[in-house]
Amino acid sequence: MNFFKRLFSKSNLELQINDGGRLAAGFKGKAGDCVVRSIAIVTGLSYQKVYNDLYKENEEFRTTSQTKLARSLKQKNDSPRSGTHRVVLKKYLKKLGWNWTPTMFIGQGCKVHLKKDELPSGTLIVSCSKHITVVKDGVL
């Protein structure tokens, strides 16, 4: 919650707490599953389905990709509870029909912030520093 308090000190977005169906799916405790929760919220898919899908996607990426990133993940659990890498997130969103649109590029500095007047209307999955969240028509 401290993350959101710091974030909201500079934002004009309304805050709505939503676990994306995590508790209803029987999951308890804290987790780094912001990707699962965010995708469940924006797509309307169940938390459990998104969790299971991302588990498989994480495992597939780790075992089939020849990248340095995949090799470094060999020691890691495939569970989306402990995070999902951006490469896997983008691939999964594409399968669901979503388009990843970057607003920041190398060498350009930060031009878009979590402020209502800087974000387009509609439903967005927003990437912050080591976190993914949802903004829907000005509500975080």
Describe each PLM feature range.
Residues 61-130, 136-138:
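Conserved active-site-adjacent core of cysteine acyl-enzyme catalytic domains
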Residues 2-73, 87, 91, 95-98:
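Active-site nucleophile-adjacent alpha helix/oxyanion-hole segment immediately C-terminal to the catalytic cysteine
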